[in-house]
């Protein structure tokens, strides 16, 4: 390999090293965008879980009201039916608490991992999918260029003068 191509390879490696802080900033921006996506998904998951729990609690309250009315009216058959309804909906409420607890746990882990105060604090870093894909493509191209250039520079023989 000629001296000029060797110099060009090392010069390009230096350019890549000089650009490293900028690429690290882009990497951090991409990481935060992924955290924002995760925050949005968990926020939605928690909202759905709370809505499901509220619906089950409403069903349970209605069954209890119907049970009380049947008992007050002395209707043993209806009271027996609504006792079973109360047990069923009490079970449904207990089951609906699981997804709420799971979402809250995962949100807590995300906030701790990212050092954020709230999901909204993370969601401000959201990027459009195309913007994030472009950013990740730029980072991947830089990493590929760096790896190829570094390996090329390592392949040069050291010649004693």
For the regions a language model picked out, list residue spans one by one.
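Extended, charged heptad-repeat coiled-coil rod domains that mediate dimerization and scaffolding
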Residues: 1-161
